[in-house]
């Protein structure tokens, strides 16, 4: 994430008309690190403080600084929240256990994100105030959920109760990232992009488009998904259950604050 921004800005500066070329970089909500309630609201201007071991966030911070100090006249940096895309309901990776159930996100619908980029690229009269700015990218108030709530909604859409698929303490209780934005509406004012899509309908569309092997998950015998799918996933590298099983001191300290807190 560090090399490309530097390469792109250098390439723009080498053009005969660099001041007329816009350079947009994509950052992440991860740049501001762990935001536990009651500090779960955030804005551009908050300290950049990535979570422990989050090299992704660290690289995004370096990339953001590179673009800001590139010397270009037209640049913008978009700190994207979690992207609600077609495959989000199918994610089965131990990294999902890094999310804290009491954490929050203001999701960005993938169609909204695409519309924003399209509007910037195709509108040569985009509001001049947009350039030379850093923005939080989210789909607004309807898309603000706690992680527990959004997971519950997605599992319910498959016809199951989340509590039958995994236990609460299979997930970290700290050291993730996420916040609800106090300032994401400002980007919408400058470059309108939000569709106002209903979250529940969007979840239903994702589930309806999933393979049949996945949509049948809610009708499996109780404990089947939990013990034969979710538990083995959580025991893989980077999974919280593996940290606990192996009593990994660094992992347990980072994601739970100690073995007794798990």
Annotate the PLM regions.
Residues 99-124, 133:
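Substrate-positioning beta->alpha
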């Amino acid at each position: 994430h560090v090399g490309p921004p530097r390469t792109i800005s250098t390439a723009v500066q080498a053009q005969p008309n660099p001041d007329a070329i816009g350079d947009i970089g994509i950052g992440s909500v991860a740049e501001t690190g762990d935001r536990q309630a009651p500090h779960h609201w955030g804005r551009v201007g908050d300290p950049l403080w990535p979570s422990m071991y989050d090299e992704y966030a660290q690289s995004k911070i370096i990339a953001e600084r590179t673009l800001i100090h590139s010397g270009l006249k037209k640049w913008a940096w978009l700190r994207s929240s979690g992207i609600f895309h077609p495959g989000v309901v199918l994610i089965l990776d131990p990294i999902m256990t890094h999310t804290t159930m009491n954490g929050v996100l203001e999701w960005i619908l993938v169609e909204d994100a695409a519309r924003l980029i399209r509007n910037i690229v195709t509108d040569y009269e985009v509001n001049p105030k947009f350039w030379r700015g850093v923005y939080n990218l989210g789909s607004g108030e309807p898309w603000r959920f706690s992680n527990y709530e959004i997971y519950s909604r997605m599992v319910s859409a498959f016809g199951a109760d989340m509590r039958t698929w995994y236990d609460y303490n299979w997930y970290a209780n700290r050291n993730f990232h996420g916040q609800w934005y106090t300032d994401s509406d400002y980007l919408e004012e400058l470059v309108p992009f939000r569709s106002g899509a209903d979250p529940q309908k969007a979840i239903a569309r994702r589930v309806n488009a999933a393979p049949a092997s996945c949509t049948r998950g809610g009708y499996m015998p109780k404990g089947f998904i939990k013990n034969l799918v979710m538990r083995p996933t959580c025991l893989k590298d980077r999974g919280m259950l593996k940290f606990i099983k192996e009593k990994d001191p660094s992992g347990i300290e980072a994601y739970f604050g100690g073995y007794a807190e798990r």
